[in-house]
Amino acid sequence: VLRKMIRFTAFISFPLMFGMALVANELILITVTEKWAPCVPILQLLCVWGAFSPICELYKNIVISHGKSNIYLYANVIFGILQILLLIMMLPYGILWMVAAYVLAYLCWLLVWHCFASHLIGVRLYHVIRDILPYFLITLSVLSCAWWVSFFSGNIYIRFALKIIVSAILYIGIMWGVKSVIFKECIGFLWKR
């Protein structure tokens, strides 16, 4: 069940969050104007965090559902202390480096949560990587194509729309073409409603 939930999470969160990272520049410029342009890399880093955050939450829920609230508490306290140390160390370098350090630490800490879940239910890292890698690679390929198609447009609104439309069409088309089980189940669920 966990592996299916991880696949579903990757199927949804990777295109949405990495897609937001792709349109971050246009989104910031359109919504809050040029003066906020330095925030674009911060938003992109937070999108990377957001792509993997739901997977981490699944691991945390495994720990809690097995009655290991002590592990949950200790892991969160240790990570909180690590965040404070990173904040202090990165303070002289500015907020961008603070966010980058946080995202990197979070991704590394995801492995800690995986170790706890693996100990409790026997899920292997190899299987998790095998489950999420296709969605990750398809998402990166789709977004690369969308970036390339939109690259030649000088109009920010057209570029923004092209990135979203091309990404959505390609992602759905590829999922349909490779006969993704998760995709078919989602479509089936939506049609039943």
Model regions: which residues?
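Specific pore-lining/lateral-gate transmembrane helices of multi-pass inner-membrane transport
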Residues: 1-77
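Short alpha-helical transmembrane segments in multi-pass integral membrane proteins
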Residues: 8-17, 76-80, 96-118, 164-168
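Short helix-capping/hinge motifs at transmembrane helix termini and TM-loop junctions
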Residues: 23-28, 32-36, 67-68, 90-95, ...
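Alpha-helical transmembrane segments of multi-pass membrane transporters/permeases
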Residues: 59-88, 96-99, 131-132
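Hydrophobic alpha-helical transmembrane segments in multi-pass integral membrane proteins
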Residues: 84-88, 139-154
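Membrane-proximal transmembrane or re-entrant/amphipathic helices at the cytosolic face
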Residues: 118-125, 132, 147-193
